[in-house]
Amino acid sequence: MVIPSTFWLGLGYFTYFFSFGIFLPFWAAWLKGEGIEPSMIGILLGVGLVARFIGSLIISPRVKDPSKLIKALRLLSLLALIFAVGFVFGSHWLWLFFVMVGFNLFFSPLVPLSDALAGTWQKQFTFDYGKVRVWGSIAFIISSALTGILMSANGINFSISSLDIGWSMSFDSLNGWIGKEVFGTHHIILAFLIFSITVMLLGMMLKPAVMPVGKEKTTNTNTVSFKELLSEKSVWQFLVCVTLLQAAHAGYYSFGTIYWENAGYSPSTIGYLWSLGVMAEVLVFTFSKQLFRRWSARNLLLLSGICGVIRWGLMGISTELPVLIIIQILHCGTFTVCHLAAMRFIGARKENEIIRLQATYSALAMGGGIAVMSVIAGFMYEHISNGIFWVMALVALPALFLRPKVEAHTH
């Protein structure tokens, strides 16, 4: 079956982030449901993040021929599905360690390779990347909310009172038909994840109307070395700053769901809270040009740091719903504004520095820093519970003073 190329790309983003909207907010809850201790949950999530970093940094750049991008995406989707199914076959920490590494290793390169495909297609025909990419964020919002509902509800009810139409299905009857307690329990997380990745793979198997073409990329001999790049004070200040700001999310990513469950919130409410954070993120990304047209990377990092100290401090103080709503809205400051600052700083560098600096930023801020703090948070959560969010606020605090004082070089 042949479909429009932009539809193929949008479907890929939608199904990937639909899966990620199940995995990121609720995987710690699944591990807890399998009887894993908080300290081991932190280790497993940290190992997964390290594997994501390795997958993005090593696997993605190996696809140098743009015409091979779709084959690579199909293969990685298949491998991710195989490892997702692997979670069914055991809950011993050693087995989970192995499967977490494999799943994240092959799941993580899907977005950078999809972005590379988008860039290739933009050279072949004109389309609005933002309008295609936004379907990923919409999918995350839907799946995180829906997973919470399927975990906590007793069934599905649908009615239109004005037309006297009604329909309902009990989860007890569904579970009885399956022969296992899946719906309304933590088991739905894994089942839903496997289903979503299966749909992603099936979507990848469709044929886009326009296949990607291009010349194989060759190594740029003018690329600056890591040593040369890090010898500049503003660069290492930038990297330390963004790594601290993103690493401060580790407590939230790893234990936010469990913390809110222990505070008495239902999985459906928790799903809505996660969705709210992404909705705020989408709004800021959408209107970033209007909001921050004249902001420097240094000032954006200041705003992100202030939001981080406030957000994580509030999370350690209160679990009242109005406060949690404010906390989740602040996600657009702690994550989105920080990412916008990074893109502004990196985009203003010399051309031969951009690829290496982008890779270093992704490795440290979006991978390594969060991985290390996830492991630390796992050990700390057992002893100080909500105190880990105060620690996260302290992690973000030095970033206020480490912001690069000199603006990045221009092209």
Question: Residues of each region from the PLM?
Answer:
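A late C-terminal transmembrane helix in Major Facilitator Superfamily
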Residues: I355-H383
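Juxtamembrane intracellular "pre-TM" segments in multi-pass secondary transporters
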Residues: M1-I3, W177-G179, L206-V242
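Helix-to-loop junctions at the C-terminal end of transmembrane segments
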Residues: I54-K68, M151, L283-S296, Y381
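Intracellular juxtamembrane helix-capping segments at the cytosolic ends
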Residues: W27, F107-K123, T336-K350
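Structural signature of the two symmetry-related core transmembrane helices
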Residues: K71-V85, N299-L314
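Hydrophobic core of transmembrane alpha-helices in multi-pass small-molecule transporters
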Residues: F14, F83-A84, W93-L113, T243, ...
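C-terminal membrane-cytosol helix-exit motif in multi-pass small-molecule transporters
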Residues: M151, G155, I188-V213, A399-E407
